[in-house]
């Protein structure tokens, strides 16, 4: 699949190289909503409305896009139940469950260190001529 010698040297994947396909995976995983959706589904299957209520601030459009991206990547399974109206439930696949462990650790780390990050940003902004806008 890869012809770049550097990729072959690392067994076909090296995210530090522009030509490595794993960068698209990192792009997906760096989205805050992906982290939060995976975390919410780690506790078990959920319907769209329950997910939306759990994820304060997410729009319907963003939740739909995030779920589609996760389903496309094999991290989330979508099951439609034959009811009237149809009910749809989302759950993590085994691959998504594996990711949930890592995402959970990142979420916990961010919660534990948010005070330090906020302080560092305040100190930086105080030294800068113009405050840096939040990400």
Annotate each PLM feature.
Residues 12-62:
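N-terminal helix-turn-helix DNA-binding core of bacterial DNA-binding proteins
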Residues 49, 68, 88:
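Residues within the helices of the helix-turn-helix
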Residues 50, 62, 91-94, 98:
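Alpha-helical initiation/capping and key positions within long helical/coiled-coil segments
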Residues 63, 67-70:
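Basic amphipathic alpha-helical segments that dock to polyanions
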Residues 71-91:
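Beta-hairpin "wing" of winged helix-turn-helix
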């Amino acid at each position: 699949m890869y012809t770049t010698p550097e990729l072959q040297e690392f067994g076909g994947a090296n995210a530090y190289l522009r030509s490595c396909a794993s960068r698209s995976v990192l792009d997906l995983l760096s989205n805050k909503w992906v982290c939060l959706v995976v975390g919410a589904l780690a506790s078990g299957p959920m319907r769209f409305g329950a997910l939306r209520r759990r994820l304060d601030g997410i729009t319907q459009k963003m939740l739909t896009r995030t779920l589609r991206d996760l389903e496309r990547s094999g991290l989330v399974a979508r099951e439609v139940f034959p009811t009237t109206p149809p009910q749809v439930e989302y759950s993590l696949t085994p691959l998504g469950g594996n990711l949930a462990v890592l995402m959970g650790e990142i979420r916990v780390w961010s919660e534990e260190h948010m005070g330090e990050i906020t302080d560092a940003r305040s100190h930086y902004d105080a030294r800068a001529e113009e405050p840096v806008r939040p990400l």
